[in-house]
């Protein structure tokens, strides 16, 4: 009798372990693959065309992380066509730009322009007036990280004039 009980218990544990293993594999596969695929798709797509008076030229935005009260951060991929650029603006919580492709410019008010290429990182202090955009001959793509959004939204200022922009490229 003890042998039969032992065999039943062993079968039950083996069967239970097998089911638990299958469930774990299914859960891991269902959670990890779609997240990776979603991120890859998001970063490789241009996103939505930005219809705003805060930009000169054509640019697209693909949001990766929408702002919320838990993380107080928004992250988006911005793609600028050649010559496209933002207006002068500032972020109460600062901003970080991670250049992923192309050739572009970044300038703080009263300072020289910085030329940006793939791999460059720009850390912009809070409330620093600046603009960024593409070179005249090449698309420009960067990931924009806006931390500490609880400090307030971006403050848009005047456009970067064609005269200002053209002075840079000469």
Language-model segments: what does each one mean?
Residues 3-16:
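Bacterial N-terminal signal peptides that target proteins for export
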Residues 110-127:
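Short acidic-glycine-tyrosine-enriched beta hairpin
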Residues 137-156:
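A short hydrophobic beta-strand segment most commonly corresponding to one strand
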Residues 74-91:
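Conserved short histidine dyad/triad with adjacent acidic residue
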Residues 92-104, 109-110:
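Glycine- and acidic-residue-biased ligand/ion/polar-headgroup-sensing regions
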Residues 28-72, 154-170:
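A short, N-terminal "cap"/entry segment at the start of jelly-roll beta-barrel domains
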Residues 24-26:
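C-terminal motif of bacterial Sec signal peptides marking the signal peptidase cleavage site
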Residues 88, 106-107, 129-135:
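Short beta-strand His + acidic residue motifs that chelate non-heme Fe in jelly-roll/DSBH
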């Amino acid at each position: 009798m003890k042998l039969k009980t032992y065999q039943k218990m062993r079968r039950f544990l083996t069967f239970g372990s097998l089911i638990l293993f299958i469930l774990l594999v299914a859960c891991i596969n269902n959670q990890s693959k779609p997240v990776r695929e979603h991120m890859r798709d998001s970063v490789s797509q241009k996103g939505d065309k930005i219809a705003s008076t805060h930009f000169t030229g054509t640019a697209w935005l693909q949001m990766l992380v929408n702002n919320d009260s838990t993380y107080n951060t928004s992250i988006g991929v911005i793609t600028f066509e050649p010559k496209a650029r933002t207006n002068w603006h500032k972020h109460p919580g600062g901003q970080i730009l991670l250049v992923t492709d192309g050739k572009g410019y970044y300038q703080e008010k009263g300072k020289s322009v910085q030329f940006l290429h793939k791999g460059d990182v720009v850390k912009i202090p809070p409330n620093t007036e600046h603009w960024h955009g593409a070179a005249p001959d090449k698309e420009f793509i960067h990931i924009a990280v806006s931390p500490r959004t609880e400090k307030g939204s971006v403050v848009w200022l005047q456009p970067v004039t064609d005269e200002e922009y053209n002075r840079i490229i000469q």
